[in-house]
């Protein structure tokens, strides 16, 4: 990576450190804060009113740096569009003064619509394949719709306690370095990590700002699109075990309650289960991030020693 690119990435972090306090103060003046869902843990009640939609800042910094570094348009537009969906969700939540924003079907419809464009764009320069197996193009479109939208929502589910979604994303994105084939791929990894790290300075417990759906939906879409672009769909599964665990815990919880009338966990997603067991938020973030990275390292070690 050249000095120019490194300086651009460093500037993202520094600007984030400078901008976030101003963003937080501005949101407080407008009284635009997070509403806590009623079915969530009572431990979170004190967080109500905390400025949200912090994703606006790190997405903006990433897009500007991405344009400077001439990153692929798929990544830039993915951040913008999924960030926009999340912003609409946050906006509705704030205006209507409730924890839920857009309806689930509305978010999914918008996510599916844009993922079709992602699949079309990617197929202009790579073969229609899934996990290295050639498939009909319609199946690749379907796979892209499910993967990108699925990861977008998985990251959103993980964003339930201070710092969790951000640190899990960082520990999921960094391992892709080991399979990067060009400087552009390295840049695509760090162009999102650097401003996100500046966000995490203010999102660590007690959080002064939340990323909101603006940030979480965009992050999940970004990492899955990056994996598709670089033919790393299989690696994605091993680099994001916590995102998968959070999603699976919700599916199991809902299925168990519908079929058996019993809950498997004290609360889902599973990070809330550990909260109600008495784990502090810092411990959950540390343990989840460590396991996320450890599983990725084991996969890399296995792959490199085949």
UniProtKB/Swiss-Prot annotation:
Domain of life per record: Bacteria
BP-aspect Gene Ontology terms: cell division; cell wall organization; peptidoglycan biosynthetic process; regulation of cell shape
EC number: 2.7.8.13
Single GO molecular function: phospho-N-acetylmuramoyl-pentapeptide-transferase activity
CC terms in the record's Gene Ontology section: plasma membrane
Matching InterPro entries: Glycosyl_transferase_4, PNAcMuramoyl-5peptid_Trfase, PNAcMuramoyl-5peptid_Trfase_CS
Listed Pfam families: Glycos_transf_4
Pathway stated in the Swiss-Prot or TrEMBL entry: Cell wall biogenesis; peptidoglycan biosynthesis
TM regions (residue ranges): 1-21, 49-69, 75-95, 104-124, 130-150, 160-180, 182-202, 209-229, 234-254, 284-304
Keywords assigned by UniProt, alphabetized: Cell cycle, Cell division, Cell inner membrane, Cell membrane, Cell shape, Cell wall biogenesis/degradation, Magnesium, Membrane, Metal-binding, Peptidoglycan synthesis, Transferase, Transmembrane, Transmembrane helix
Catalysed reactions, semicolon-separated: UDP-N-acetyl-alpha-D-muramoyl-L-alanyl-gamma-D-glutamyl-meso-2,6-diaminopimeloyl-D-alanyl-D-alanine + di-trans,octa-cis-undecaprenyl phosphate = di-trans,octa-cis-undecaprenyl diphospho-N-acetyl-alpha-D-muramoyl-L-alanyl-D-glutamyl-meso-2,6-diaminopimeloyl-D-alanyl-D-alanine + UMP
Uppermost EC category: transferase
Cofactor(s) required for function per UniProt: Mg(2+)
Membrane topology qualifier: Multi-pass membrane protein
Subcellular location: Cell inner membrane
Role description: Catalyzes the initial step of the lipid cycle reactions in the biosynthesis of the cell wall peptidoglycan: transfers peptidoglycan precursor phospho-MurNAc-pentapeptide from UDP-MurNAc-pentapeptide onto the lipid carrier undecaprenyl phosphate, yielding undecaprenyl-pyrophosphoryl-MurNAc-pentapeptide, known as lipid I.
Protein family per UniProt: Belongs to the glycosyltransferase 4 family. MraY subfamily.
PANTHER family membership: PHOSPHO-N-ACETYLMURAMOYL-PENTAPEPTIDE-TRANSFERASE (PTHR22926), PHOSPHO-N-ACETYLMURAMOYL-PENTAPEPTIDE-TRANSFERASE HOMOLOG (PTHR22926:SF5)
The name this protein goes by in its record: Phospho-N-acetylmuramoyl-pentapeptide-transferase
Species of origin: Fervidobacterium nodosum (strain ATCC 35602 / DSM 5306 / Rt17-B1)
